[in-house]
Amino acid sequence: MISFIKGVLIEKDPTALLIDVNGIGYEVFVPMTTFYTLGDIDSQVSLYTHFVVREDAQQLYGFKSKVDKKVFQELIKVNGIGARTAIAILSGMDSKTLLHCIENKDYALLATVPGIGKKTAERLVVEIYDKLLKMANEIYAQTSGTTTTSQDSQAQQAPTSVVLANSIFNESVDALLALGYKQKDAEKMARSAMGDATTAAEVIRKALQGSIKSKG
């Protein structure tokens, strides 16, 4: 069981990383809430991990905190929610927001996540309610909100060319597709979130937040 990984960040794409650990490259899938906290390529990265073994694949999922890892592990225990859907949930909302949804039985907000309908949202609340409330102190102890990396801060000061804007848009759409959104919805979400954004991470963050607010 691989429970933690520390190494050099070789590649980073929304939802998937390549980390060099003593010459061995590990592909690690991450929620966007973890992706936002990453440093630049060639920087050191440390993640808590959960290893999933299936008949057709072995996949490693990484999280910025032990709490997020625990929440993920509880989510995938819910009938009808696999690892991909759990990652989509933790991409659209942090652990605190998820806890609020569970406490308030906000089925409509949970149903904004791709792959989750009303029935699945209701089942999620029933099955995870007590477990998540027991973790409330750990969840609230985490720093609220997402972290803006120095790379994002520097990029926000730079002008965006048409070519760069197209690249950011396409990368954002690909990330939203990977999270389970349909092509038409992904393009609409990315387009509405573009504004003066200068990184794909910024667009994706705004798109996911916008999706939650519009249906919350």
Swiss-Prot record:
Region named Domain I: 1-64
InterPro entries: DNA_helicase_Holl-junc_RuvA_I (IPR013849), Hlx-hairpin-Hlx_DNA-bd_motif (IPR003583), NA-bd_OB-fold (IPR012340), RuvA (IPR000085), RuvA_2-like (IPR010994), RuvA_C (IPR011114), RuvA_C_sf (IPR036267)
Keyword DNA damage: yes
Domain II: annotated segments: 65-143
Ranges in a coiled coil: none
Gene3D superfamilies on file: 5' to 3' exonuclease, C-terminal subdomain (1.10.150.20), DNA helicase RuvA subunit, C-terminal domain (1.10.8.10), Nucleic acid-binding proteins (2.40.50.140)
UniProt keyword annotations, A-Z: Cytoplasm, DNA damage, DNA recombination, DNA repair, DNA-binding
GO MF annotations in UniProt: ATP binding; four-way junction DNA binding; four-way junction helicase activity
Lineage top rank: taxon: Bacteria
Entry's Gene Ontology BP terms: DNA recombination; DNA repair
Main location: cytoplasm
Region ranges (Flexible linker): 144-163
Region named Domain III: 164-216
A GO cellular component entry from the record: Holliday junction resolvase complex
Intracellular or extracellular location(s): Cytoplasm
Family: Belongs to the RuvA family.
Function, in words: The RuvA-RuvB-RuvC complex processes Holliday junction (HJ) DNA during genetic recombination and DNA repair, while the RuvA-RuvB complex plays an important role in the rescue of blocked DNA replication forks via replication fork reversal (RFR). RuvA specifically binds to HJ cruciform DNA, conferring on it an open structure. The RuvB hexamer acts as an ATP-dependent pump, pulling dsDNA into and through the RuvAB complex. HJ branch migration allows RuvC to scan DNA until it finds its consensus sequence, where it cleaves and resolves the cruciform DNA.
Quaternary structure and partners: Homotetramer. Forms an RuvA(8)-RuvB(12)-Holliday junction (HJ) complex. HJ DNA is sandwiched between 2 RuvA tetramers; dsDNA enters through RuvA and exits via RuvB. An RuvB hexamer assembles on each DNA strand where it exits the tetramer. Each RuvB hexamer is contacted by two RuvA subunits (via domain III) on 2 adjacent RuvB subunits; this complex drives branch migration. In the full resolvosome a probable DNA-RuvA(4)-RuvB(12)-RuvC(2) complex forms which resolves the HJ.
Domain-related comment: Has three domains with a flexible linker between the domains II and III and assumes an 'L' shape. Domain III is highly mobile and contacts RuvB.
Listed name of the protein: Holliday junction branch migration complex subunit RuvA
Lineage: Bacteria, Pseudomonadati, Pseudomonadota, Gammaproteobacteria, Thiotrichales
